[in-house]
UniProtKB/Swiss-Prot annotation:
Keyword field: Cytoplasm, Methyltransferase, S-adenosyl-L-methionine, Transferase
InterPro entries tied to this protein: PCMT (IPR000682), SAM-dependent_MTases_sf (IPR029063)
Top-level taxonomic group: Bacteria
Gene3D superfamilies: Vaccinia Virus protein VP39 (3.40.50.150)
Protein name: Protein-L-isoaspartate O-methyltransferase
The keyword Methyltransferase belongs to this UniProt entry's keyword annotation: yes
Top EC class, one word: transferase
Cell location: Cytoplasm
Length: 220
């Protein structure tokens, strides 16, 4: 897909600088860096924050939600170890930026968002950009999307106090889940690998996400 009509030389220059920052911070996957270099993050940011589109920081997108810091997007995506043929479940569509990164790197993306307005806005952005491998659902992300399970990869972009049971069930044997786990104010990002009935955790570092709300998440 050619995004030139949505871009400017200034934005492209800022993306290149951002990619260099991400490299310096330890992101190694060239595929992930290429996706960040390609995708116009400014299209996913509210008008009042346009000047900050390519800063390495999270930004508000309304409804108490945020578009994640680019480093965290890159870290989570890199941790999924996508080869290009995966079916991915994303919990928390948000602005749709992480969704677009995933759509560049995997075969099919199934994304669930509980806030209707955010889902509709993300859907419009991704359609305008030409992505036709993304499927959207309005609902409780802690329940996953059972209809299309199992998934090769699951990415959760909100913080849970534990792994929601439905997501464990919907992850394919041998699959990978990336999820922030902890309290409301601070969590650790984990890469979870499923092997039979066992789930092996690898700690990727401290993070701060908005709470994952739903039947198997925070209740308020």
């Amino acid at each position: 897909m050619d995004f030139k009509k949505f871009d400017t030389p200034e934005y492209e220059h800022k993306r290149r600088k951002l990619v260099e920052i991400l490299k310096d911070e330890g992101i190694k996957s060239q595929k992930v860096l290429n996706a960040i270099l390609k995708i116009p993050r400014h299209m996913f940011v509210p008008q009042e924050y346009l000047s900050l589109s390519y800063e390495n920081e999270a930004l508000p997108i309304g409804y108490g939600q945020t578009i994640s810091q680019p480093y965290i997007v890159a870290l989570m995506t890199e941790a999924l170890n996508l080869q290009g043929n995966e079916k991915v479940l994303e919990i928390g569509t948000g602005s749709g930026y992480q969704t677009a990164i995933l759509a560049e790197l995997a075969l099919e993306i199934y994304t669930v968002e509980r806030i209707k307005e955010l889902l509709e806005e993300a859907k419009k952005r991704l359609r305008v950009l030409g992505y036709n491998n993304v499927y959207f659902k309005l609902g409780d992300g802690t329940l996953g999307w059972e209809e299309f399970a199992p998934y090769d990869r699951i990415i959760v972009t909100a913080a849970s106090y534990d792994i929601p049971e439905p997501l464990k069930e919907q992850l394919k044997d041998g699959g990978i889940m990336v999820i922030p786990i902890g309290g409301r104010d601070f969590q650790y990002l984990y890469r979870i690998t499923k092997k039979g009935d066992n789930f092996y955790r690898e700690n990727l570092g401290g993070v701060r996400f908005v709470p994952l709300k739903g039947e198997y998440g925070w209740k308020d």
